[in-house]
């Protein structure tokens, strides 16, 4: 298989401008399918903006972003048609009046018991089940959102601020399940964090951002596969 055939994303001269301020400016970045990527950088470095572009939630000001060798399809009004196989954690609407357990049983009726045993057995996480979504703390909501993503079997899973609000048990389970998903299903996983240690443990490729530019790409646990250039 040639190198281009393994690409799932390709970015060229990608720029995003908000109110005359350039937030990201990426000369070139290639993301390969079936790989776990970590996007690292300080607050304000452009991580969230980059992830939202990869998810099809925002349009670039300039440049090219290809998913599966094609730019995203658009409606006649110019809005991006987000592919259903791309899952951006936290972007899927569910009724805030329902409890966590009710949502799980509603969305995944055939495997709700397994989900509860797998993700809500810890001393902290098990307290989440009877709570309504509108009463969840930011950390509890982040865990619930990730659980929905892990069980949705997406082709691409994207999460901003990975593990920022998790305790040690939650972070361990999250890493374990993301690695399982990647290994068993071939899911491309793209995570961001300000914490180098959180992603270095299990990402195959680490992409470092600063002031909207890629400053370096380094291999994590496996051989480096991402290619980039600054501009």
Regions flagged by a language model, labelled:
Residues 55:
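Helix-to-loop junction immediately C-terminal to a conserved catalytic motif
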Residues 40-42:
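The feature captures the beta-strand-to-loop junction immediately N-terminal to the Walker
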């Amino acid at each position: 298989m040639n190198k281009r055939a393994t690409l799932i994303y390709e970015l060229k001269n990608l720029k995003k401008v908000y109110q005359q301020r350039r937030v990201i400016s990426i000369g070139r970045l290639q993301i390969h399918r079936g790989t776990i990527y970590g996007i690292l950088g300080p607050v304000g470095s452009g991580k969230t903006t980059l992830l939202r572009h990869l998810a099809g939630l925002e349009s670039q000001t300039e440049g090219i972003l290809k998913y599966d060798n094609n730019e995203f399809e658009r409606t006649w009004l110019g809005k991006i048609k987000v592919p259903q196989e791309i899952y951006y954690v936290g972007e899927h609407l569910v009724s805030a009046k329902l409890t966590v357990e009710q949502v799980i049983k509603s969305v995944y009726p055939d495997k709700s018991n397994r989900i509860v045993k797998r993700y809500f057995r810890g001393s902290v996480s098990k307290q989440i089940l009877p709570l309504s979504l509108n009463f969840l703390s930011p950390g509890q909501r982040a865990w619930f959102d990730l659980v929905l993503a892990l069980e949705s079997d997406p082709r691409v899973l994207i999460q901003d601020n990975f593990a920022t609000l998790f305790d040690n048990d939650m972070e361990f389970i999250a890493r374990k399940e993301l690695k399982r998903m990647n290994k068993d299903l071939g899911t491309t996983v793209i995570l961001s964090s300000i914490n180098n240690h959180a992603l270095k443990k299990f990402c195959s490729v680490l992409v470092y951002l600063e002031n909207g530019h890629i400053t370096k790409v380094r291999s994590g646990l496996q051989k480096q596969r991402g290619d980039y250039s600054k501009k």
